[in-house]
Amino acid sequence: MSRANPPSNSSGSRKISFNVSEQYDIQDVVGEGAYGVVCSAIHKPSGQKVAIKKITPFDHSMFCLRTLREMKLLRYFNHENIISILDIQKPRSYETFNEVYLIQELMETDMHRVIRTQDLSDDHCQYFIYQTLRALKAMHSANVLHRDLKPSNLLLNANCDLKVCDFGLARSAASQENNSGFMTEYVATRWYRAPEIMLTFKEYTKAIDVWSVGCILAEMLSGKPLFPGKDYHHQLTLILDVLGTPTMEDYYGIKSRRAREYIRSLPFKKKVPFRTLFPKTSDLALDLLEKLLAFNPVKRITVEEALKHPYLEPYHDPDDEPTAPPIPEEFFDFDKHKDNLSKEQLKQFIYQEIMR
């Protein structure tokens, strides 16, 4: 086990220590988040470039839960468009265990950075959305909701390969916890959040991920977020400004009386044609966008239907869009009991997952 210091991050204010095997030569800091840092590294025996994600989750139960979900799900899926875990650094002992190191494929950038720095061609948009939906088909067939799809969670490399990452908010679609439990700790980026999450529809379904894909496609087409809400009310207002006031049928699909009353209190809004918002975009792209961004989740296109949409015809291949087996019922057992689990118990779960 070596204690390696990668180059300090851009602020230049501190070094970041990585307690990883001497098989890895640590290179540069490539990303930082709330409870972790990612460095590029070289696996010396093979010469392979990898990303090492150092996570320090044990201060907060929420970070422990996210880490556990991430490890379990990334190990479960084996898919070209889902980031894979190549290895997990085994700790020396439980007593000294206070950091998690995930070794993953190294990707060069992410969709957020790409959208900010360049205009995407129609062909790029097709290929990136196709790959995102291809990954989502595997997740949804396994009864997994990602719940946090956004441009920064779509990793890219120079030849336009796309891989979905960050499964820390994922849940089983099969076991409907009561919706309040489902929503606790829901910190997904507001801009990509489906309206039913804010309006508490009867249940949350795979359609919440489809909405996020619609928001991402819109952002790729225009170079800016479609619904950049500053808060809950602003977010809903922006959505209704574009989609118009819900029909009576859609209105009564909203479970929460308070949410219904709030929508009734708003002035009537006419739908804005997507053609007005995206004047240079192809008809097929706009047709898919309409179907991805249906207000009512019941009317929203499914992932399978979206893959067959004419806009994605250049890439669609039904023989090369694999599913994944449904996750076992006990897969997310720890989530069912999360409110009663101590940080120490969660740490034990993470340790067991690493050592298995």
UniProtKB/Swiss-Prot annotation:
Domain Protein kinase as annotated: residue spans: 24-312
Q: Name one GO biological process term.
A: MAPK cascade
Q: Name one Pfam family in it.
A: Pkinase
Modifications the protein undergoes after translation, according to the UniProt entry: Phosphorylated by MST7.
Cofactor(s) recorded for this entry are: Mg(2+)
UniProt keywords, alphabetically: ATP-binding, Kinase, Magnesium, Nucleotide-binding, Serine/threonine-protein kinase, Transferase, Virulence
- Enzyme nomenclature, EC number: 2.7.11.24
Report which reactions are catalysed by this protein.
L-seryl-[protein] + ATP = O-phospho-L-seryl-[protein] + ADP + H(+); L-threonyl-[protein] + ATP = O-phospho-L-threonyl-[protein] + ADP + H(+)
Disruption of the gene: reported phenotype: Impairs the formation of appressoria and the ability to infect rice plants, even when inoculated onto wounded leaves. Leads to decreased transcription of the cell surface sensors MSB2 and SHO1. Blocks the transcription of both virulence genes GAS1 and GAS2 during appressorium formation.
Any one GO molecular function term? protein serine kinase activity
Q: What class of enzyme is it?
A: transferase
Binding residues annotated for ATP, in chain numbering? V30, G31, E32, G33, A34, Y35, G36, V37, V38, K53
Report the PANTHER family cross-referenced here: MITOGEN-ACTIVATED PROTEIN KINASE
Describe its function.
Mitogen-activated protein kinase; part of the MST11-MST7-PMK1 MAP kinase (MAPK) cascade that is essential for appressorium formation, penetration and invasive growth. Central regulator of appressorium development that acts downstream of the cAMP signal. The MST11-MST7-PMK1 MAP kinase cascade transduces signals from the cell surface sensors MDB2 and SHO1 that recognize various surface signals such as surface hydrophobicity, cutin monomers, and rice leaf waxes.
Q: What protein am I looking at?
A: Mitogen-activated protein kinase PMK1
**Originating species:** Pyricularia oryzae (Rice blast fungus)
Q: Which lineage ranks, top first, belong to the organism behind this chain?
A: Eukaryota, Fungi, Dikarya, Ascomycota, Pezizomycotina
